[in-house]
Curated annotation (Swiss-Prot):
Pathway: Amino-acid biosynthesis; L-threonine biosynthesis; L-threonine from L-aspartate: step 4/5. It comes from Vibrio cholerae serotype O1 (strain ATCC 39315 / El Tor Inaba N16961). It is found in: Cytoplasm. Its main location: cytoplasm. The keyword Kinase applies. GO terms for molecular function: ATP binding; homoserine kinase activity. Belongs to the GHMP kinase family. Homoserine kinase subfamily. The lineage of its organism: Bacteria, Pseudomonadati, Pseudomonadota, Gammaproteobacteria, Vibrionales. Transmembrane segments: none annotated. This is Homoserine kinase. Keywords: Amino-acid biosynthesis, ATP-binding, Cytoplasm, Kinase, Nucleotide-binding, Threonine biosynthesis, Transferase. It catalyses: L-homoserine + ATP = O-phospho-L-homoserine + ADP + H(+). It holds the Pfam family GHMP_kinases_N.
Amino acid sequence: MSVVVYAPASIGNVSVGFDVLGAAVSPIDGTLLGDRVKVEAGAEAFTLKTAGRFVDKLPANPQENIVYDCWQVFARELEKKSVVLKPLTMTLEKNMPIGSGLGSSACSIVAALDALNQFHASPLDETELLALMGEMEGKISGSIHYDNVAPCYLGGVQLMLEELGIISQSVPSFDDWYWVMAYPGIKVSTAEARAILPAQYRRQDIVAHGRYLAGFIHACHTQQPELAAKMIKDVIAEPYREKLLPGFAKARNYAASAGALATGISGSGPTLFSVCKEQAVAERVARWLEQNYVQNEEGFVHICRLDKQGSKVTGSEL
C-alpha cells in the first residue's frame, strides 16, 4: 500500500493581504508546479528518499529535512489519539525552488502531512492537519503563518482568520483570471525579506492597507473583478522589498502597459505574479518576463489559473 500526494505552489499575501491572504495556483498546460510526496510501507520506522529537479538544494542529512519534522509531529499527534504509527518510507519529489516566493516549504509540508494522514486512513481532521502545517512552517520561518500552507492544502484563495477554532476560510474568486508566475532563478530568504520591513508604519499606510484589503474581499464576495483587481495594492511590503528584486519595477510597468490587471510580489519574492483577464495578454506578459525578468536557467515563467483543489492524491506511484 502506498499513496502519493501533490501539493501546488501558492502566492503568499497576494499583495493586498500581508500574512493573511494566500492563493494556490497551477499551470494551465498541466505542468506540475509543486512538490509530491510518496508514503509506502517500510522496513524501519522512518526512511527518507529524495528526488526531483531541485533535489540538490535539500539538506544531505535526512533529519534536517522538513519532511522528517513532519513525520515527527504527525507521530506525536497519533500518539495522543492512541493510533499506531506504521513503519514507512517517504519520498520527497522536490520540484519547487527553495526561497522562491512560491510557497516551496509549504508544498513539502502539505504534501508530507497530507500523505502521512492518507496513509494512516485520515486519523487527523482538516483543522488538526492544517494546525500542524502552520507549526512546521513556523519551524522554518520563525513564526507560525498559514498564508502558504492554507491555500496549498485547501486550494483557491484563503483568508487567515485564526478565531473560533477557524484557521482560514475560502474567498470567492475570479475563475477566468490568468496568473502569470515568473521566478527569476535567484533566491530571496524569507528572513531577509522580513528584516527589511519597518517596525512601525505611518497612519496613512495603515488606512490605505485596510481600505485595499477590505475592498478586495468585498469585491470578491460581490463578484466585481475590475474593482478587485484595482485593490491588489501593497503598501506594507512591496515598497521596501522591491529593492531585493532586480527588474521588478520595470516588469510591473511593462505588465501594466501590456494590459495586465495587477502585478505584485509572490510571498517574499523573488517570484512575481501578474493577473491578466485575457490569455493573449497573459502570453504577451509571459514572453516579456521570460526574456527580461528570468536571470538564469533555473528561472521559469508559467501561465496559471487558481488551483481550486489544493493538495490531492495523484495515485500510488511517483
